[in-house]
Structures are given as structure tokens and as C-alpha cells.
């Protein structure tokens, strides 16, 4: 089977259900491991299978035929959402729906009034227009924000068309890589991207970098031999979009485009269904709550008004009025702006968020599955340890060269550094003299580059060393003899040569009979061999890649200058050499990672490492960064300590666990769940991309909110499936950036922790904003309710309500997004999405039932004071509504017998509206200050939030402007107030402040008590 059976384009089924089943089946197919057997075929069988001459390539006619049949060699781009759909989602998604319903109801009410009355009031018409405008403006704003992020995304895409060198009809030609077909004979050399999946038929020192596919940072050798059953591990297959690092190779293309291994991963990623974000679910829950309250109030008063004798049509208008009054017009804009501010703050801290809702998702994350290479580590091999003079020395692996130093005076070190510098083909790329050595780019294999940098740092210019000891001959590294050897002219001896050699330590040692100690050659005895073995095991156990080094001074009488050394028919000694030492390399952890992992742990977030690398290396790095914390053991550790076989250890005793990809392959979902449940510290090593996806799904089954980090194409399915996918901005592949929700611009795991902190903070602050905004709903609704029940003149008009919701309340509500955290938010457990809601019943009861009621009292007090000053005592107001609103009544008497015309009555009524509005502003001062904290006293929190202080001043200034600005009486029916009327609501404002401070004091004194259960939101 050549992987062509399931092409992602094959979904054509008549009915939707069948199509869904088909899609699920395909995804399951894609989740399976790669299945191909071309690596097992002999070259003749290969030629027959693909009808190709292995030396001359395809004929042009045959190539054109295959191209027409298979289509171009390119990945199908993931289905993109058209811009108009994105825009409509912003206009009609989530919260906006509530406002649209409100607007439609307003137009409906206006229509009813227009049909019934001769001169209908235009309030409902204004209200409908304003609601629609709010949704449209906010929608445009959110759309613009997301479009900006996706613009940054598009700039990541590399637009350079890739070229490939193919041999057709015996001639080498450069063609566009899209035109490569199955069966083509392709040649790749160091620096090229592999244009398609191909089976190698001949190679010369070829190495490829498979890290984007498997996550292994070491370059892999490629040769025609079939070395492994698994096609991903065998040496004779090269994969599409991996890079050839050095050497050359020829191969036959076995699959192109979406049928390549890389293509299957990309289709797997684009085919996954993405769940809703936690914040979207929260907003839905909130809308359900608010709608519930609104409909309940509306229907209650609808029935009540019918009982009180109103007509059906009047009752319907009341019903609509109450429902609309419950809609918090300003909240949609507030939430959008708060999320945008956080997204901007995160971008400054190197987290680019692609969609606003992901901002909060990161805060509710409870599990992070992190890739190792490049995310937790620096993604550059570095020399970590040396063993010479029978001692292990530590090298410096820090990013800024501030780490350990060792004694460089030993003559043995001089010999070791000379071998590492000479027997080494890596060079620095030109023009980097001003860059620090550790950051320079090199040409060559990762291990050799590490040696080059190490020697350059400790011994000065390697280039000078090589110029003084010119190379005469060399045997490059190959997988059969596992060493690399070169012979150089010695600078200190005008006649002599030195032979230097490095390679796998055990292979080097068996060629040596002597060892260099303190600069003296001594015979290599059993004791030294044991010391070597111990050092080798210790360094290998640290997950490091160990190389051995030896040399031999060639006798000048046998090998004078000008001697013809022959590397093929070896005419010089390659045994009886002198062993000098070991050097070991590792891709070291990034400096900020251990601290970040510690913060995650105290924040209750489980960090799981998922990598394609070796278990030993993975475990060493996991211990280095604290994913496996000190003192925690795996089953293997316990077995080694107690000296018993692994099978006798109870796996539950081990807190840590390293799972090998091959074991994961045979596990059932239940066994995986068992591991995820029972171990707190988990490392998955040697995993394939499909397994990454299975691990993420496993975590989600446990009810976790999962964040996944990754940079390779292999990570994209997991990135897409996770609740929040985090891609790397520098090292990340385009496919992974496409699949992710967030991009770390500096590739640093530590940035995720700041992201989590911002996400948690915005969740807390959104609660505060919502509590603040909802509270003023009660003083806005109650006037209308009393107007219906007690038949009093309307205390607060529609226009004034809009001035509060879209005017005075906006800036203060947004200013709460800038509020600092109350306690250390990184010390608490992640929120449980099932129980810990953004808006819960307790928040509604606090805002509506307690604080809102006090605010309404303040407003009514002011209303009654003004009417009483004008001669209407409260008792006279009951039942006066019909006469009050009747245009033909111009002789309405007040409590003192004075007669009022319709116009005069209305001026007093509108003055009352203005004063009620001013009272709400005054009580909202206190509300804003108490909403700063949910548990602490305001005196503990302080007033450091400058934006909030500005918000207080701004709402007061706006209220004064609306009241005193000339012309407002005509435009908004707002009238100037006497100064004393502003003070009517002050006592209520103080009452709110005192009430809430006492409540919070009880909260802190009796945590978990009755008050907390009933009022802590």
C-alpha cells in the first residue's frame, strides 16, 4: 500500500450523516501510523513498481501523464473562512444576538405605538437604532482586531517557490517543486529542502534534519540500506519538507502532495473539529442567565399589568420595555475592549493572540503539553561536560556564558581541544564577527558546531589553529566504523604529522593502547578502562551525546612531509592510538524554563513533556527543568534503587513516569487515562505526531483544559485539537502557526506563564466589569415597574438609560480591566469550567438584589425630593399617571392646589429624569470602588489604578455636561439641576461602600462561611 488509498479529497457522500461518518473514518485513518513498504523493496522492484529507469529517470511524456493524474505536488491549503463570514460571526455571535433581539423588539413596540396613537413617542425608535449601532460598531472593532492578527500571520508565510533538481530522460533539469511526480528521480544536496517523500537509491555522506517531523534535534544519516521496519526510522526514506543538512543523495519519489507523510499530518490538522472556547461558553451561560431574568420579570409584570386593567397592547409594550431594559447595552463593547487590551498587553510580552477569546482560555488552562526541542530547550547543541585526566569537568551551557568554568591549564585539555578543533568540518558562516560566539550561525552538523563553539570560546580562533595545522587527508564519519579521522601537518614539528580521531567512545577506546594523563602518555590498563566506562555511563545517563577523542603523533621517519596518505586503501596506523578524553553535548534547557515550570506547578497546572527524542535525553531535560521534580522517581528509578525487576514495582508508587512511544502504540484509551490520572509528572518520549493528538484527547477526557506548545509540522494536529494551541514564532513551521491560537514571538516557554497570568487576571477583571455594569440595571428597571404598578409619572426615561449604559458607565467598566490582581493569582488552582462561572447566581444576586436595590432607593429619593419641592407630595403621585400624560389636561392640581399645564408638568418630569440619572452616577462611584476587589478591602488594594480614577472623573464630567450644556433640553430632554439635588444620593453611595466593606471583612474573617457561599462571586 503506497499511502494513496486515502486522499483527503475523497469525501463525496450524498447525505450529511454519511459525509460526517466518512470524515470520522478518514480522521481515524489519518491518526494511524504511517503505512508504507517502499523501504523494504529492492531497487529492481522499486523500478518496476514506479515504471522508472533508475539511472535515466522518467520520460517527459510519462511525467506529464502522472502529473495530470495526481495533480501538483503541493499541500491543499486548509479551508479558510471567507472574510464576510468572519464579519457576520462578529456581528451575530454570542453577546450580539441579545442586543439584536432587543433592537427588533424596540422597533416592534414602536410599530405598535405608531399604529395606536396619533403622536407616538419616539423613544423606542431611538432605542432600537442605538442598540443596532452598538452591535455594528463593536462588531467592526472585533473584526478589525482579528484581521490585524491574521495580517501578522500572513507575513509569516514564505512565498518563495521551491525548486527541485530532477533527472528526466538522462538529463538534469531544475523544475518547480510543484511539478515533481511519483517515480521522478530526484537529487538533493546539503541546504536543499526535500521536495517529496522519496526512497534513497544512492547517497554520499547525506544527513537530513527531521526535527520538524519527528522532533529529533540530531541530523539523521540517509543511505540506500533498509535498516528499520518503521518507515519513519529507516535510513532509506527522505520526507517531504525536511532539510538536507550535508552530503548528496538520489532517490525515487514515492508520494507527493497530500499523500506525503507531512501532507497527511497537515490534512489531519485541518480536518479536526475545533471546540468552543471556555469564554464563549461563559458568555453563552451569561446570556442564558440574563435572558432568564429579563423574561421572568417581563412576564410577571405583563400578567400584573393585565390584572391592573391595562389593555393588551399596553401590556405588550410594557413587556418589551422591561425585557429591553434588562439588556446591558454597554457590556458587549466592554468585554471586547477588555479582551483587546489584554491581547495588546500579551503582545508586548511576546504572546501574539490570534483570536481574542484565546486570551482567557490560557488563563483557565489546567494542563500544558509541551514540546521539548526549542521550547523547553535552546535548540542548539552545546558541549556540557568533558572527561580528561580521569575527572569530569563541567562546561558552560548557559545562554549568556555566565556558568561554570574549568581549569584550562592542563596539557591534556590542550590536546583534547586541538583534536576537537581539527577533526571537525564545521565552520562559522562569514560576516558574524560582531555576534557573540554562542549565537553565531555555523555550517555543519549540530554536534560539530557545538564542539567548534566550545573550542572557540575557550581557546580562541579555531580557524587559526586549522591554518597552522593544515589537513592532509581525512576519512569522514560513516555509520559502519562510527569514527571520523583526519591527518594534519604539525605546527611545532617541521617534519611531523598528527593523526586525530573522534567518534563513538567505545569504538575509539578499542583502537587505543595508551591514555593521556596530565600531558603524559601512560598504558591503558583495566583500571583506566573502568574509569572510562563509569564516566561514559554517567554522561550518557544525563541524556548527553558522548564522543571519544584520541590522537597519534606519526613518526616523521616513516611519514615525512609530502607523504601520500591514502584514505581508501589505508596506509597509516588506525590502532594503537592514545586516548585523550570524552566530550558530551546536550541541547540545554532555556534559562527561564525551570522557574516557569515551578510557577505552573504552584498555579496547579500540570506540565507534560511530549517529544520525539530519546527517553534518556527527555528524562534528563525533564529533570533539568523541573517537569520531574527533585526526589520524584519513575518505576525504573525505584527498581534500580531496590535492585528488583521493574515488573515487581507498584506503578502507583512512582509519581513520575516516562512513557515510550512504542508502549503508547499498544495502549488502550483506558490504560492511557490510568497513566494520566495516577502520575503527576509525565514525559512521553519517541512519540509520533498522531500519538501527540491521542495524548491531548486523553487529557481532555480527564476534563482538563489543555494548552499544547509545538513548532514542527508534526505538532499541528495536536495544536489544533487542544483548547489552546501555542506555536513558536521563530522556529515554528507555517503549518503549526496556522493551526495554533497563539504564537510565542520569542519561542520561550516562560512567556506562556505570563500569558496564563494575564488570562487569569482578565477573567477576574471581567467578573468585576460585569458586576459593575449589571448593578445599574436595577435603578434603570425599577422606575419603569413603579410607573406600571403605582401609576406614577415616569421617573427615568429611555434616553437617560442609554446615557448611563453607553455614556457614563463605559469608561469606568473598561477601567476595571486595568485593575491589578488582588492576591497572587498564580498560587491558586485553575478554575473549574463546570463550577466556576464568569457570571453566577451569586454575582446576579449581589448586583441585582443587594447593591442595585440600594442604588434604586437613592434614585427614587432624589425623584420624590424634586417633585415634593415642586408641590407634588408622594401621596399625590399615586395613580396620577393617566392625567399627567394627557396632553389635553392643562389644569392638573398638585398637593397645594396649584394648577399645572402639560408643558410645565413635562419640564418637571424631565428634570426628574436628569436628577435620577445624576443619582445613578453618584451611587455608581461607590459601586466602581467596591468592584475593584472581590475579597480584599479597598484599603488593602489601594487606588493605584489611574485609569479607574480617570473613569470616576470622566463619568462625573459627562453627567454634568449632559445636565448643564445649553440645548440638551431639546436634544436629549436633559435639564439643569440645582446643586443640592446632586447630594440627595450621597448617603446611599456611602451606604453601598460601608455595606460592601463589612461584607468583605466577614469574607476574610470566616472563609468558606455562609456569607462567602451566598455572596462571593
Curated annotation (Swiss-Prot):
Q: Where in the cell is it found?
A: Membrane; Cell membrane
| Extracellular membrane side | 104-126, 304-315, 787-796, 861-912, 965-979
- Keyword flag GTP-binding: no
Spans of biased composition, class Polar residues? 209-224
- Keyword terms of this UniProt record: ATP-binding, Cell membrane, Ion transport, Magnesium, Membrane, Metal-binding, Nucleotide-binding, Phosphoprotein, Potassium, Potassium transport, Sodium, Sodium transport, Sodium/potassium transport, Translocase, Transmembrane, Transmembrane helix, Transport
GO terms under cellular component = cell projection; cytoplasm; plasma membrane; sodium:potassium-exchanging ATPase complex
Which sites are catalytic? 371 (4-aspartylphosphate intermediate)
Report the family membership.
Belongs to the cation transport ATPase (P-type) (TC 3.A.3) family. Type IIC subfamily.
The entry describes its oligomerization and partners as:
The sodium/potassium-transporting ATPase is composed of a catalytic alpha subunit, an auxiliary non-catalytic beta subunit and an additional regulatory subunit.
UniProt protein name: Sodium/potassium-transporting ATPase subunit alpha-2
Q: Which organism is it from?
A: Gallus gallus
